[in-house]
Amino acid sequence: MLIDNLDKGWPTRGASREDILILRSLLGATRKLQRQLERRSVAFHCLVFLRNDIHDLLVAETPDKGKDTAIVLDWDDAEAFKRIVYNRVSGTLTEKASFLEAWQAIADVQIGARDSFSYLVERTLMRPRDLLRFVRRCIEVAVNRGHERITSDDMLKAEESYSEDMLLETQFELRDVYRENADPFYKFLGCNVYISSGEVLERANGDEKLVELLVWFGFLGVKEPRQLEPRFSYEVRYNVAKLLAPVKENKAVFVIHPAFRRALECTG
């Protein structure tokens, strides 16, 4: 039995204790049903799909942890995103092809000196829907320009509208869980990509909880001198405390996520 969309429409980080109680009761019922069917020699397994944030709340609110086995769908690997796009593109090809061949059939493989697919993935919050939205925007631009394939210029143009989409969506998600200061994003308009903790706190009107939420949603990442690349919440399983630890010791700076830079006209 597969159960999905239970948490559809629930705000990010906004599930109530009543919501979690419903989930606990459901899982308890599936275990009971499994035991009853097994006594009749009927094989039965139930798989419940939950968002990461809802699962974390469920674990925190469950006293008897460990009864259910969690399988994490790993979306922090670019190879998984290649598979998503390949499955959608390969059906249009006459011959079986590798991902690179399939991608090359519909788009330029380079943006300047950079791999074009990696460029798109880096501008997502590592969610499949982000990548598919970006690709759709690229297709729209290519079609409007009369191109048979997506060019690198099409991708750069599509990034403008995609970045606006991401900014608005994240703004709506933040409003669902934090109405006290729900529109902080435009305070970062025109800011540098790399920004000190003091400046972030100033732009957030001194609201430390808001800063934590901006990190949790992936709007802000953290860059330490010892690291080549900044890290974002989805790369540490949304462990915000771990990300913020070097910032609080003045050993790191904040970074605006690439998905939002075009919309906010960031510099640097």
Positions of PLM-derived features:
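The catalytic "switch" region of P-loop NTPases
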Residues: 6-113
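C-terminal leucine-rich, beta-strand-based interaction scaffolds used for sensing/assembly
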Residues: 111-141, 146-268
